[in-house]
Amino acid sequence: MASKENTKRKELHRKIWAIADDVRGAVDGWDFKQYILGILFYRFISEHMADYFDRAEHEAGDLEFRYAELSDQEAEQDFKPGTVEDKGFFILPSQLFKNVVEDASQNENLNEDLANIFQAIEKSAIGFKSEDDIKGLFDNLDTRSNILGGTVPEKNKRLSDILNGINSINFGNFEENDIDAFGDAYEFLISNYASNAGKSGGEFFTPQTVSKLLARLVMVGKDKINKVYDPTCGSGSLLLQMKKQYEDHILEDGFFGQEINMTNYNLARMNMFLHNINYNNFDIKRGDTLLNPQHLEEKPFDAIVSNPPYSVKWVGDGDPTLINDDRFAPAGKLAPKSKADFAFIMHSLNHLSNKGRAAIVCFPGIFYRGGAEKTIRQYLVDNNFVEAVISLPDNLFFGTSIATTILVLAKNKLENKTLFIDASKEFKKETNNNVLTGSNIEHIVELFSNYQNVDYKSALVDNDVIGSEQNYNLSVSTYVEQEDTREKIDIDVLNKEIAETVTKIDHLRAEIDKIVEELSYGK
């Protein structure tokens, strides 16, 4: 049964990507992604809203009711009150994806109609608690852009192709499938766009297997957490792994994230809705996490998962006020201007609760470089905040082949020790990238859970040793011995084989000499 479902899922993904590739024409897929993802989202929220009303009326006894067939006036009067408070937005029947796609091919005002619909959906939340969660959601879905074509008819043709393409995808009955098929399709598209985009794609999507590992690590030994936070959330893939891995009652107060890039910020919010996370259970903000943190009032967080940009530039000590910032001041040094890695780490530590855990993907150089980075490492080690350092295989991420490292932070450690795990061999080779398999993830989590020495796999090291003997070097290779996989040679056996070979050679020489002597006599 599982194999059949997996085959069906792969076929659905193949069709979705074929449609996305076909409708973009000569436009670069990366530049076109917001239209495919945005229209898929539009279809989802339309079907979600229609199903919301249909289900309620059917349960009340009106089995013939269809929200999509109502007049806008009836819907406005009978269904809008209370809906925005519950769902966060409202869509009139005429604005539903189903009704728009019916005459999309003949609609000479399609691009303007869609722009007005998207604007109306956003405006429906004005004055309600969901206003900030909906505001600007469709900003990147510009139906007037020349990306779609140079003339209005060309724009309308491209938009009609997208609408009909998305409409042709069979997600099954919405009531039965709910959001699973939509959410899965959205994640698949994001992953493919990221993979094809290379380096730029890696900025907004963390591969699902790495996301799954981080989600597992932060929950080891925990039955529930208050909320989960990603300070550089991209498209929200890391946050959503927490939802996929754990039941709702385990994550009590929802999902929080911040993202500096506008497109990624909108993708993350759409991603939340597509995975059935209601507006009142997530809070995604836009802005520079280091210079304009948006969740100071919501901290602390029991779980933080993050894959911040590697060694990007920031203002650092160019802003003299930052050394007094509560997030950075405790270490006594700011991260270097050319490498903001430890600024993100200190930010996460500041937002972490006393019983929480953070798992952060890092560039490996930060664990051994000197200067300010060494000073910050010393602060983390001396205050016993480093729970584990885990080296990952290379080529796991889109756009970079470097072998990254996971830094695990906690504030409630019982021992002044740090666990180092060498997971560099835990992968399966695929066409373009290495991937973590389910068994790889289980093995890494098991090593972390057991928190002990395992030959060639993990080393539990006293913090005093890290400081006094290793000068606060946190590289895994410093502590976990590499297994010598060369064939071991038994000298005694080798000497015996050599002696036997020499004896054979001597015997053969004697035989040859005898033959030569006989030949000489024959002459």
Q: Which functions belong to the PLM regions below?
A:
Residues 2-3, 7, 298-523:
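A conserved structural/catalytic subdomain of Rossmann-like adenosyl-cofactor enzymes
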